[in-house]
């Protein structure tokens, strides 16, 4: 999965993208509702000389949660401390991070749904009262002391908000749903990134890259860099529509932003399971992918684009999925040969 050109997750080759990230809300493209709310909340907090209330970003990976955390830290003139749920293994790890913060700092916890429950409970007084409760000693001699913490902002990010416990979720003052980007928004992101990379690109080519980026800025920037490589070798370095299409076709990212694995999922449902319904476990076993990977990585985009439907009985291919392969349901029933073998 990590080697997919259209994986929404951060990979080693994406490190150059850090320089492409906006640093202010004004520079940030997309997520209009989230951006508008954050703009008001940040201005209100600064007007009252208070830290920003705690924020939870949830949604598919690659949509800008970490970027917004950086922007919030910049806007609040605080430092950003970044960690993740799996990285905090002991209560002492979290205590060390919390006591190192200063006023207006931002603590960003990625994959916050993977925090150990016992560690999670340490966050409750930290979020509510800016306090850290420490137990000294053991048994009957144990006693609890409370340390004051600076006025910091906790930003949590998760791709699976349903796995958060209610006590933790309820302590966030702002819950922000991150949505897939429109093709037009991604075009603007590609144009902006190309300018930073000193690459000449026409808007038609930028739109083509954006259209095939699965609604995800991280993928758009990754594809831009690969198209840049292609045009440096095959063209004069400038990216036009013809060069963009040729590069993306060579990368096997089709006009809908689907790659070989996406098409494999659709082919399996249509040609091997008669269009569905098929259970997620069965589908995962058939195509050789982890169940969580299908549910968290592939499905959101396929559902959002209308290729598959999630039903109580399993996954069902839509008419759009059949059209994608140029077949109708009747033709598929007349010829049940898997196109895996073609």
UniProtKB/Swiss-Prot annotation:
Reactions performed catalytically: ATP + H2O = ADP + phosphate + H(+)
Intracellular or extracellular location(s): Cytoplasm
Domain of life: Bacteria
GO molecular function: ATP binding; ATP hydrolysis activity; four-way junction DNA binding; four-way junction helicase activity
Family of this protein: Belongs to the RuvB family.
Protein purpose: The RuvA-RuvB-RuvC complex processes Holliday junction (HJ) DNA during genetic recombination and DNA repair, while the RuvA-RuvB complex plays an important role in the rescue of blocked DNA replication forks via replication fork reversal (RFR). RuvA specifically binds to HJ cruciform DNA, conferring on it an open structure. The RuvB hexamer acts as an ATP-dependent pump, pulling dsDNA into and through the RuvAB complex. RuvB forms 2 homohexamers on either side of HJ DNA bound by 1 or 2 RuvA tetramers; 4 subunits per hexamer contact DNA at a time.
Name of the protein in question: Holliday junction branch migration complex subunit RuvB
Disulfide topology: none
Keywords: ATP-binding, Cytoplasm, DNA damage, DNA recombination, DNA repair, DNA-binding, Hydrolase, Nucleotide-binding
NCBIfam families: PRK00080.1, ruvB
Subunit note: Homohexamer. Forms an RuvA(8)-RuvB(12)-Holliday junction (HJ) complex. HJ DNA is sandwiched between 2 RuvA tetramers; dsDNA enters through RuvA and exits via RuvB. An RuvB hexamer assembles on each DNA strand where it exits the tetramer. Each RuvB hexamer is contacted by two RuvA subunits (via domain III) on 2 adjacent RuvB subunits; this complex drives branch migration. In the full resolvosome a probable DNA-RuvA(4)-RuvB(12)-RuvC(2) complex forms which resolves the HJ.
Gene Ontology biological process terms, A to Z: DNA recombination; DNA repair
Main location: cytoplasm
Ranges where the record places region Head domain (RuvB-H): 255-342
Enzyme class, spelled out: hydrolase
Binding site for DNA: 310, 315
Region (Large ATPase domain (RuvB-L)): 1-181
Record: residues binding Mg(2+): 66
UniProt entry tagged with the keyword Metal-binding: no
EC number in record: 3.6.4.-
Species of the source: Clostridium botulinum (strain Hall / ATCC 3502 / NCTC 13319 / Type A)
GO cellular component, one term: cytoplasm
Small ATPAse domain (RuvB-S): region residues: 182-252
SMART domains: AAA
Domain remark in the UniProt entry: Has 3 domains, the large (RuvB-L) and small ATPase (RuvB-S) domains and the C-terminal head (RuvB-H) domain. The head domain binds DNA, while the ATPase domains jointly bind ATP, ADP or are empty depending on the state of the subunit in the translocation cycle. During a single DNA translocation step the structure of each domain remains the same, but their relative positions change.
Binding site for ATP: 20-21, 62, 65-67, 128-130, 171, 181, 218
């Amino acid at each position: 999965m990590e080697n997919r050109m259209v994986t929404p997750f951060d990979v080693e080759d994406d490190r150059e993208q850090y320089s492409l990230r906006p640093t202010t809300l004004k520079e940030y493209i997309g997520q209009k509702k989230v951006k508008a709310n954050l703009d008001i909340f940040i201005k209100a907090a600064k007007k009252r000389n208070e830290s920003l209330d705690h924020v939870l970003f949830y949604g598919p990976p690659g949509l800008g949660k970490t970027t917004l955390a950086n922007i919030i830290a910049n806007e609040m003139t605080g430092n950003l401390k970044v960690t993740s749920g799996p990285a905090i293994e002991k209560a002492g790890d979290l205590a060390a991070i919390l006591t190192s913060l200063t006023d207006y700092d931002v603590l960003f916890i990625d994959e916050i749904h993977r925090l150990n429950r016992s560690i999670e409970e340490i966050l409750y007084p930290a979020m509510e009262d800016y306090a850290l409760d420490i137990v000294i000693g053991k048994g009957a001699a144990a006693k609890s002391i409370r340390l004051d913490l600076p006025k910091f902002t906790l930003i949590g990010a998760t791709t699976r908000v349903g796995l958060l416990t209610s006590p933790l979720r309820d302590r966030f003052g702002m819950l922000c749903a991150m949505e897939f980007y429109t093709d037009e928004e991604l075009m603007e992101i590609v144009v902006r990134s190309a300018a930073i990379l000193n690459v000449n690109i026409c808007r038609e080519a930028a739109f083509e890259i954006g259209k095939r980026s699965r609604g995800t800025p991280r993928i758009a920037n990754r594809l831009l860099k690969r198209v840049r490589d292609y045009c440096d070798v095959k063209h004069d370095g400038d990216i036009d529509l013809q060069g963009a299409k040729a590069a993306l076709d060579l990368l096997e990212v089709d006009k809908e932003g689907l790659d070989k694995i996406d098409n494999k999922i659709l082919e399996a449902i249509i040609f091997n399971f008669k269009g569905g319904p098929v259970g997620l476990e069965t589908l995962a076993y058939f195509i050789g992918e982890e169940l969580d990977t299908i549910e968290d990585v592939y499905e959101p985009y396929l559902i959002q684009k209308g290729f598959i439907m999630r039903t109580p009985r399993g996954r069902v291919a839509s008419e759009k999925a059949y059209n994608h392969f140029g077949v109708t349901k009747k033709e598929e029933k007349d010829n049940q040969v898997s196109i895996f073998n073609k």
